[in-house]
């Protein structure tokens, strides 16, 4: 554990408060016209997912936990959770469903992810920013609909719904942002 000033915390940092680990979701430095500047932290407790909001004076000390980030390759999913392999030493790590969260729908066999561990225990996983998926269902294009920049709903091969341009049809492979399920472009493969 390392003590740091609250204003140096950023999104993704892990802090130790009362022997519980929290991941920082947002960190905002607020400088009011009158009074001392403060740092507003929105955090999620790693053990059970409870979200909290804390305010610290910018010079206050906070304990930042040592977190190790290493690339891992996704292998498979089973009843225990999601199995990842470290490509350096071929060790396999099981990540539980609650650590994986909503991003599990984007996992594909062989996908490279960044796994964060604290004392050897997986606490967070970061997927690639973009994934390529196939459109399995979408509304047909209506003639003249392309005049305006309208989007239509589409269902991806992993079950996620997104909005795509009118020229995209079922069977087309598209690139999707994993952070917000948004369409980026047609896949170039």
Swiss-Prot record:
Keywords: Cytoplasm, Elongation factor, Protein biosynthesis. GO terms for molecular function: translation elongation factor activity. Pfam families: EFP, EFP_N, Elong-fact-P_C. GO terms for biological process: peptide biosynthetic process. PROSITE patterns: EFP. Pathway: Protein biosynthesis; polypeptide chain elongation. One of its GO terms (cellular component) is cytoplasm. Signal peptide: none annotated. It is found in: Cytoplasm. HAMAP family: EF_P. Involved in peptide bond synthesis. Stimulates efficient translation and peptide-bond synthesis on native or reconstituted 70S ribosomes in vitro. Probably functions indirectly by altering the affinity of the ribosome for aminoacyl-tRNA, thus increasing their reactivity as acceptors for peptidyl transferase. Belongs to the elongation factor P family. This is Elongation factor P. The gene is efp.
């Amino acid at each position: 554990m390392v003590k740091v000033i609250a204003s140096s915390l950023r999104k993704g940092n892990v802090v130790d408060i009362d022997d519980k680990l929290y991941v920082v979701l947002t960190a905002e430095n607020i400088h009011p016209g009158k009074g001392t500047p403060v740092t507003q932290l929105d955090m999620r407790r790693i053990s059970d997912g409870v979200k909290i909001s804390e305010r610290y004076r910018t010079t206050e000390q906070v304990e930042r936990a040592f977190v190790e980030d290493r690339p891992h390759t996704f292998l498979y999913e089973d009843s225990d959770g999601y199995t990842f392999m470290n490509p350096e030493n071929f060790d396999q790590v099981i990540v539980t469903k609650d650590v994986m969260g909503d991003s599990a729908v984007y996992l594909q066999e062989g996908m490279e992810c960044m796994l964060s561990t604290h004392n050897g225990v997986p606490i967070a996983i970061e997927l690639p920013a973009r994934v390529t998926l196939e459109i399995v269902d979408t509304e047909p294009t209506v003639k003249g609909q392309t005049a305006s920049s309208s989007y239509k709903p589409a269902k991806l091969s992993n079950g996620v719904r997104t909005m795509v341009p009118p020229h995209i049809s079922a069977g087309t492979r598209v690139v999707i942002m994993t952070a917000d399920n948004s369409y980026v472009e047609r896949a170039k493969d």
